[in-house]
């Protein structure tokens, strides 16, 4: 989509983490549809990264699958090196996250029932992963004199969430990091903003998703929102696209709730 598109990305190269499914996939596709010059698709699962890269190429946009564990600094450096085949990365979306397999079901253990190794897993992906990607991406952005960094955080980091203490702490740390980078990098034409999410529809097949959304657990979750539904991947992608575009060129250090009104509807 080019021409009079106010969200036209001007052929810039994007690197999206956690892009193999759900919101990350939607973000990668949205950037491709709005004139990104190429998209580096990063995901922990190589097959998912490759599948989304193929979807983007089918749109006529260059893409490369660059799978890695974002918590592994050496792996992140290698992923960015592979992305250089597309050109210099000036759009970074830190979407990769880990809340644990049972978070949306309310079956995570109490904090005092967890082990330190559990905390490490949450901090590795949700905070260290963001720092790793920014540390590798920023030198090139500074060299280019421009850049957009968008980081997905969580309402859990702002208000707290029972049975997700380590996850909430990591996401709160990421939100603080976003603001610090905004202060450091702004003079180089680089913005740093965050999107704060609540619960998204789980990445299931249509039948399983319909069953979950009709469940009492899903109804309990959505009862906390002014808009009585769970978030959808495209909801997140729309905000990420805006923050990556020139329409947001004088916005930095901000955290935008994309949460159906959870911020005030409790």
What does each model-identified segment do?
Residues 1-5, 159, 219, 223, ...:
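Short C-terminal tail/terminal secondary-structure segment
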Residues 90, 98, 112-131, 146, ...:
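Catalytic Tyr-X3-Lys loop
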Residues 134, 170, 178:
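Active-site helix of classical SDR
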Residues 77, 99-120, 143, 163-166:
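Conserved mid-core segment of classical short-chain dehydrogenase/reductases
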Residues 154:
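Residue(s) in the substrate-gating loop at a strand-loop-helix junction
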Residues 139, 183-184, 249:
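Alpha-helical segment proximal to the catalytic Tyr-Lys
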Residues 2, 6-40:
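Canonical Rossmann dinucleotide-binding motif of NAD(H)/NADP(H)-dependent dehydrogenases/reductases
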Residues 186, 191, 196, 251-253:
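Short, small/polar-rich loop/turn modules that mediate ligand/substrate recognition or access, typified
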């Amino acid at each position: 989509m080019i021409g009079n598109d106010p969200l036209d990305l001007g052929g810039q190269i994007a690197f999206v983490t956690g892009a193999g499914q759900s919101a990350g996939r939607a973000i990668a596709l949205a950037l491709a549809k709005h004139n990104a010059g190429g998209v580096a698709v990063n995901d922990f699962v190589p097959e998912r990264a490759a599948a989304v890269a193929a979807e983007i190429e089918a749109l006529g946009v260059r893409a490369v699958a660059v799978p890695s564990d974002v918590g592994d600094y050496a792996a992140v450096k290698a992923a960015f090196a592979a992305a250089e085949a597309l050109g210099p990365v000036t759009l970074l979306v830190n979407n990769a996250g880990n809340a644990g397999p049972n978070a949306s079901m309310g079956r995570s253990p109490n904090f005092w029932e967890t082990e330190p190794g559990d905390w490490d897993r949450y901090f590795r992906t949700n905070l260290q992963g963001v720092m790793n990607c920014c540390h590798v991406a920023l030198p090139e952005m500074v060299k280019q004199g421009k850049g957009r960094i968008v980081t997905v955080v969580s309402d859990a980091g702002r208000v707290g969430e029972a049975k997700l203490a380590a996850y909430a702490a990591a996401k709160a740390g990421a939100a603080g990091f976003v603001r610090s980078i905004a202060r450091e990098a702004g003079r180089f034409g680089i913005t740093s903003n965050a999107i704060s999410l609540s619960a998204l529809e789980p990445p299931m097949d249509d039948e399983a998703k319909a069953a979950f959304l009709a469940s009492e657990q899903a109804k309990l979750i959505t009862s906390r929102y002014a808009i009585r539904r769970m978030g959808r991947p495209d909801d997140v992608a729309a905000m990420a696209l805006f923050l990556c575009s020139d329409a947001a060129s004088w916005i930095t250090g901000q955290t935008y709730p994309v949460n159906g009104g959870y911020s005030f509807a409790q």
